[in-house]
Amino acid sequence: KGMPMHEQTHPPMGKYLIALGEILFGVTPLGWRFVCALLGVLLVPVFYWFLQLLTENAQVSLVGSALFCMDFMHLTLSRIATLDSLVAFFILLMAALFLKLLKMAAEEISCGRKGPSAKVLCLMLLDGAAVGMAVSTKWTGFYAMLGMALCFFGAVGVWCCRAKRKGTSCRYSILLLAEGIGVYSVIPFVIYLLSFVPVMKALGEKNLFQVMWKVSVFMLDFHSGITFE
């Protein structure tokens, strides 16, 4: 509506999601809390799925999810309009998708496939989108992405070492690595860049890259300059 933007200390995606609730229900307590509460609820089944992938034990996953439902931080942050529950949802989603990706890739390697299947690539694209949403909501997602990258390189390294010990080709792992570098570099960056399109229009600018860089530098300067007394 041409109103000045007073908050640029975080990437804009999370604020768009909160605004979506306000569009649906107005600028009311329900409107500004709706999306955060919704994703806070969806965190529970995603957490169950993550535990199921991690432990392959339904009872452990159920108990862990039940304990998560009673976590006071989760309950509190999901009831207010903050970015924390939003970025937590996307980080947990990207972790679950990544774990599913590793399991699927390991199964294909054990079956002797020469390269990643279309299912693996689609899963990687979805995971890349989750990474992009996390980073575009809050830079906390970037640190989670770095941790995931270390796990990805580590898994590929382990698979290559196993292939060499068995005297087989590590072609699958190399192709998966190449696809991963491409997907996890391009998809998150594109989503992060496109999240600044409304910001560019609000500022009356025409260069999207310049707007993204300017706001990102402002965010970095703001957070690096925070002091506590």
What is the role of each PLM region?
Residues 1, 145, 152-229:
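Transmembrane-lumen/periplasm boundary regions of multi-pass, lipid-linked membrane glycan transferases
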Residues 5-17, 27-30, 229:
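Extracytoplasmic catalytic/substrate-binding loops of multi-pass membrane glycan-assembly enzymes
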Residues 32-39, 64, 83, 179-183:
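Alpha-helical transmembrane segments of multi-pass integral membrane proteins
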Residues 34-55, 93-97:
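Transmembrane-helix motifs of polytopic, lipid-linked glycan transferases
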Residues 36, 73-86, 137-140:
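Short acidic/glycine- and proline-prone juxtamembrane loop motifs at membrane-interface regions
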Residues 40-43, 68, 83, 87-95, ...:
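Hydrophobic core segments of transmembrane alpha-helices in multi-pass, intramembrane catalytic enzymes
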Residues 52-55, 94-124, 134, 153-163:
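Membrane-interface transmembrane helices that cradle and orient dolichyl/undecaprenyl
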Residues 64-69, 76, 96, 131, ...:
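Short helix- or helix-capping micro-motifs
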